[in-house]
Amino acid sequence: MKFAICNEMFEGWEFGRVCEAANSAGYCGVELAPFTLGKPANEITPRERKALREAARAWGVEISSTHWLLAHTTGLHINSPDSAVRKRTIEYLVHLIHLSADVGARVMVFGSPKQRCISEGITPEQAWNLAVDTFRAISPALEERGVTLCLEPLAPEETDFLNTAAEAARMIREFDSPHIQLLLDVKAMSSESKPIPDIIRDNRSVLRHFHANDADMRGPGFGNTDFVPIAAALKEIDYQGWVSVEVFDFSPDPVTIAVKSMDYLKSVFS
């Protein structure tokens, strides 16, 4: 099991400095939110991509994954009834696949709650089918570049589409592909009625990436979420992927969050 930390909480930091802080806190990976690079994925030059890889390598960390894929974009949506919108979305996701592969990330996390809500005027079934079509259209690029797209179930207060791990797993089964798998997020799982360890065990066959956070949106160990049974379940299923710290409350500061989260994770996974 490897530990990473998401970079967006280091607001305004140069990427090399983020990698330095991650390494200093004990992480071996950084999860990259493309919007933090300040421009669309297709505008990031080969030289800039190389610089990101080299910054990570210089500080002894990997770029583990990318997430918040469609954040800070306009006019993109995976289940829009407008075929032109879906075409643009597919094209941009392919750009993100190439960006991810170019910087060394082998996992892309599809959360993007606003760009997946059920579009106005269509049924949930129609939204499902359109989303499946969108993901199927990017499958060749995923396979070509050796990248896995992980669908992230999110709580109903964030989106009305793919709210449970069971729903995400059902969609994943439509593809039967090692390149479309599952991410589980502790905060999101806290909204489900089923205990988090049971969700982990039930989805062992498709679980590829994991977000560690507290139900209160802070880092692991900052709130009341008990990670001991969560860590036990991950070890029970012999999970070998990344455990990545993702927070939504950036206080008191990124270094404190990184250090205390890592200390807590080490204690529960030891």
Identify the residue ranges that each predicted region occupies:
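Short, conserved active-site loops that position catalytic residues or coordinate cofactors/metal ions
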Residues: 30-36, 65-75, 112-113
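Histidine-acidic metal/acid-base catalytic patches
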Residues: 1-26, 50-53, 57, 104-106, ...
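Active-site acidic/histidine proton-transfer and metal-coordination neighborhood
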Residues: 16-17, 55-59, 75-181
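Conserved alpha-helical segments that form or flank metal/cofactor-binding pockets of metalloenzymes
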Residues: 55, 63-66
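Conserved beta-strand positions in the central sheet of alpha/beta enzyme cores
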Residues: 31, 65-67, 109, 150, ...
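Flexible, glycine- and charge-enriched loops at secondary-structure boundaries
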Residues: 42-49, 82-86, 121-128, 161, ...
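A short acidic, helix-capping loop that chelates divalent metal ions and anchors anionic groups
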Residues: 36-40, 72-79, 116-121, 157-158, ...
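Glycine-rich, proline-tolerant flexible connector loops at the mouths of alpha/beta enzymes
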Residues: 33-53, 112-119
